[in-house]
């Protein structure tokens, strides 16, 4: 069973991961695709794959039921080598989590080469590649396990349209847990720690997925999908950044994933009924369904 799939930055490669403990990389050419590589290294089902920004090289992260996060890199062989071309190697094996690592998420590239990891052991880890080595922080986040994690845009909302923009880069992310909560974390450069700045309550069952909208206009949006058959869209205005309000969207099935369009104005929701629905905010600030996509 395939659990996750992701296109690289250029849309030329697709990585998939599966219950068979492997990751497969396909080359996409027009309407066709070709299996280019099968990566083996995990000892359990692989839940998540995530491509890093190409400015850091061709790097892929994967997380698994085995409690590990693996970082893979494509190394280009010497043109004079008999096996000229490229080969994938495992460059980092992070195994400090004591239970399944359910999701990995790369930070916006402006913030650096940072990977956040969400685990069923209740902890979040943040890996950073700097000066040719990997460092990590690991900290407790949700008592009953962390299911999902998503970074905020590097620029604060309103910074593009403000006459007095604030400091440029922020390191901030949201987590969703089996305690039914969302938590927002901010990095403190002085203490070099991630601290909870907000806890968002509203769901009555596990939060399965969270997604921070990439939009950096006047508002911030976070979508959360829950076992309670609802999606909540949390909104915070740049004029009052600590205040979050939510709007609830109701469904007939358990919900698994939420995903924003690149511009951050359309939300895709998928659940247990094999449907994807697309939602958009109207001029009154209400979220409306604009399309259903069925298999």
From Swiss-Prot:
Transmembrane segments: none annotated. It comes from the Eukaryota. SUPFAM superfamilies: WD40 repeat-like (SSF50978). The keyword Protein transport applies. One of its GO terms (biological process) is positive regulation of ER to Golgi vesicle-mediated transport. InterPro entries: G-protein_beta_WD-40_rep (IPR020472), Sec13/Seh1_fam (IPR037363), WD40/YVTN_repeat-like_dom_sf (IPR015943), WD40_repeat_dom_sf (IPR036322), WD40_rpt (IPR001680). It is found in: Cytoplasmic vesicle, COPII-coated vesicle membrane; Endoplasmic reticulum membrane; Nucleus, Nuclear pore complex. Keywords: Cytoplasmic vesicle, Endoplasmic reticulum, ER-Golgi transport, Membrane, mRNA transport, Nuclear pore complex, Nucleus, Protein transport, Repeat, Translocation, Transport, WD repeat. GO terms for molecular function: structural molecule activity. GO terms for cellular component: COPII vesicle coat; endoplasmic reticulum membrane; GATOR2 complex; nuclear pore outer ring. It holds the Pfam family WD40. It is a peripheral membrane protein. WD repeats lie at residues 1-36, 41-82, 96-137, 141-195, 202-244, 250-289. The COPII coat is composed of at least 5 proteins: the sec23/24 complex, the sec13/31 complex, and the protein sar1. Component of the nuclear pore complex (NPC). NPC constitutes the exclusive means of nucleocytoplasmic transport. NPCs allow the passive diffusion of ions and small molecules and the active, nuclear transport receptor-mediated bidirectional transport of macromolecules such as proteins, RNAs, ribonucleoparticles (RNPs), and ribosomal subunits across the nuclear envelope. Due to its 8-fold rotational symmetry, all subunits are present with 8 copies or multiples thereof. Component of the coat protein complex II (COPII) which promotes the formation of transport vesicles from the endoplasmic reticulum (ER). The coat has two main functions, the physical deformation of the endoplasmic reticulum membrane into vesicles and the selection of cargo molecules. It also functions as a component of the nuclear pore complex (NPC). NPC components, collectively referred to as nucleoporins (NUPs), can play the role of both NPC structural components and of docking or interaction partners for transiently associated nuclear transport factors. Belongs to the WD repeat SEC13 family. This is Protein transport protein sec13.
